[in-house]
Design a protein with these regions (language model features):
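Hydrophobic alpha-helical segments and their helix-loop boundaries in membrane
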Residues: 2-240
Length: 240
């Protein structure tokens, strides 16, 4: 007996009017573990950019770099040390904001009480309020005009994409002002040492080498690192 082969069955193709639904939630409406892992990896990949653009890290790192240059030290402390100090100072300053973001956005999403879009919209509120508090109105107006938008009556209505560069401009301006204040006393030491060497006829001796110990001594005597860190933290908390 010969049996004819059964013809293959084509897969079901959704009709033109049918809708395809993709579910990303797990049990009881909570996000599945794979989605949580994917979001965690995504956040880790964009964390450096978020750290640089939306927190106090940029200002702190620039001021610490100005301090090192004012002392005349080229590679001490190294950039890794300055970046580490700036990172933990940023975490210290941003701790209340991070706590609010976690409470308002992250935890409701993990509990399944909010969608991802709702969690992002609510969670970015504390971060947006922090940036608005430390952004000059002039920088907001500048970026708003550059984007071709009308100046909003309420600063909180500024789009997030416009607020971030305005915040960075304000942070850089504040960092440069602090850098100028840090440079002045060390510049005076350089001038005094140079004038003293010229008056003694020691023009071949590099003034930078002679001035460096006096700069370090002055910086240690006045507790320079403590003053710089206190000024940086106080510029955000209003203390000091």
């Amino acid at each position: 007996m010969i049996f004819a082969p059964t013809p293959p069955t084509p897969p079901d193709v959704p009709a033109l009017g049918d809708t395809v639904t993709l579910a990303v939630n797990g049990v009881n409406g909570a996000p599945s573990s794979s989605i949580v892992v994917l979001l965690a990896i995504t956040l880790l990949s964009v964390a450096p950019a978020l750290l640089l653009m939306t927190t106090s890290f940029t200002k702190i790192f620039v001021v610490l770099s100005f301090t090192r240059n004012a002392l005349g030290l080229q590679g001490v402390p190294p950039n890794q040390v300055l970046a580490g100090l700036a990172l933990f100072l940023s975490l210290f300053i941003m701790a209340p904001v991070i706590g609010d973001v976690n409470e308002l956005g992250v935890q409701p999403y993990l509990a399944g009480d909010a969608t991802f879009t709702e969690a992002v919209d609510v969670g970015k509120g504390p971060l947006q309020a922090f940036m608005l508090e430390h952004t000059r109105e002039e920088d907001l107006a500048l970026l708003t005009r550059a984007a071709g938008l009308e100046n909003p009556e309420d600063p909180s209505a500024v789009p997030f994409g416009t607020l971030v560069p305005a915040f960075l401009l304000s942070e850089l301006r504040s960092a440069f002002i602090m850098g100028f204040v840090i440079f002045v006393p060390f510049l005076v030491i350089d001038l005094v040492v140079s004038a003293s060497l010229m008056s003694m006829g020691m023009m071949m001796l590099p003034p930078v080498m002679i001035a460096l110990p006096f700069k370090l001594l002055l910086f240690v005597l006045v507790d320079g690192w403590g003053l710089v860190v206190t000024a940086l933290v106080g510029s955000y908390t209003g203390a000091g």
